[in-house]
Curated annotation (Swiss-Prot):
Keywords: Cytoplasm, Methyltransferase, rRNA processing, S-adenosyl-L-methionine, Transferase. The gene is rsmH. GO terms for molecular function: rRNA (cytosine-N4-)-methyltransferase activity. Its main location: cytoplasm. Specifically methylates the N4 position of cytidine in position 1402 (C1402) of 16S rRNA. Belongs to the methyltransferase superfamily. RsmH family. This is Ribosomal RNA small subunit methyltransferase H. The keyword Ligase does not apply.
Length: 386
């Protein structure tokens, strides 16, 4: 056991980048493989233990569950005309624009409203989608800004959109840039902001939040079983010197997490980094606000598809979608009251998963959970008492 402790301390002090097989572990990373994905095969070449960034001009990556998204959304987008004329698709998480590009290519009459909180992502997508410029509106906002984005784009905040897509998680563009601080396999500033203009950074949390707040963040957002131990060591360490880099934090985590736990379940930093990223970007509360606004924005017969990559997000989607498809008739009545029928119907049985063929072709899809709904009634059809 003494030898094991010595080895781990040496690893904590090792030169960077650390010899990890992935750029970062995030179960909800849209494009970079997590530890879960590695069993299905490497998604990117590895050099010197670090995933190699793809700088090719083809914008890099295959969108996850693309064909399934097309299958689910196209009926709503083509109900007026086969080429999508008159239809509006809202991409709430544009990223590099992979899903959007497919829909715009397939449906030459389709209009797209696309949101992203990261201005650099918007610029990359703008270049990628340049040939569709007359049919797209790009909006710099978080996805809980759906109502305002629709209004600013000339559409009503309710019942104006035919299709909505959420592809949750961290994009490759954010993970590929060490200076953004999302990845623990390279030393970088402790930033983790999806929008670089936001005020709060991971360093701010580590250096200013009290021990109880830190433990709560690590437990709630990272499901880290050693949250209290890690929080206590963070507070002790920062009293001597503030945290400034990902290497500072990874070194502490190697010391804080017991050796047996470090040997299983992937990199010991994975849960702490996930927790900090979620806290910095207010990801879960943003999703809780965004989904009801998205459902309100759907026209009758419109459809919404959500791709989630980790359980915390998927639980939120599952709960809100279950409420949306539930009858509003009191449970003790034997018949459905007129106007109290569900306003939505589920398009999937539970959560859709990537099949073996897609996982083999695109290992990034291994963790995804897909849920989809269709609006069946307008809100005003329910009467004043609702």
């Amino acid at each position: 056991m003494k030898h094991s402790a010595t080895s781990s301390e040496a690893h904590a002090r090792a030169t960077w980048p650390l010899p990890e097989p992935t750029l970062a572990y995030f179960p909800n990373a849209r494009f970079v493989p997590s530890d879960r994905d590695l069993d299905a095969g490497a998604a990117r070449p590895i050099r010197g233990g670090v995933a190699v960034v793809d700088d090719s001009p083809d914008f890099g990556h295959v969108p996850v569950l693309l064909e399934r998204c097309v299958e689910l959304l196209t009926p709503a987008l083509t109900r007026r005309h086969p080429d999508g004329s008159g239809a509006v698709l809202l991409d709430a998480t544009l990223g590099a624009g992979g899903h959007a590009e497919r829909f715009l290519t397939d449906l030459p009459g389709l209009r797209l409203i696309a949101l992203d909180r990261d201005p650099s992502a918007l610029e990359i997508a703008r270049e990628r989608l340049a040939r569709f410029a007359d049919r797209i509106t790009l909006v710099h906002t978080r996805y809980d800004g759906i109502a305002a984005a629709l209004t600013e784009s000339g559409y009503a905040a309710t019942e104006s959109v035919d299709g909505i897509l959420f592809d949750l998680g961290v994009s490759s563009m954010q993970l590929d840039r060490p200076e953004r601080g999302f990845a623990y396999a390279q030393d970088a500033p402790l930033d983790m902001r999806m929008d670089p203009g936001s005020p709060l950074t991971a360093a701010d949390i580590l250096n200013t939040y009290d021990e109880a707040e830190l433990a709560d963040i690590l437990h709630r957002y990272g499901e880290e079983r050693f949250a209290r131990r890690i929080a206590a060591q963070i507070v002790r360490r920062r009293a001597k010197e503030p945290f400034t880099s990902t290497a500072d934090l990874v070194s502490l985590l190697y010391q804080a997490i017991p050796a047996p736990a470090r040997r299983t379940g992937g990199h010991p930093a994975k849960r702490t980094f996930q927790a900090l990223r979620i806290a910095v970007n207010d990801e879960l509360d943003t999703l809780r606000c965004a989904l009801p606004a998205a459902l309100d924005a759907l026209a009758v017969d419109g459809r919404i598809v959500v791709l989630a990559y980790q359980s915390l997000e998927d639980r939120i989607v599952k709960r809100l979608f279950a409420q949306a498809v539930a009858s509003r008739t009191p449970v003790d009545l034997p018949v459905e009251l007129p106007g109290h029928e569900p306003r939505f119907r589920a398009l999937t049985h539970g959560a859709g998963r990537a099949d073996a063929a897609e996982i083999e072709r695109n290992p990034r899809s291994a963790a995804v959970r897909l849920r989809a709904l269709q609006r069946t009634q307008a809100p005003q059809a329910t009467g004043k008492g609702d």
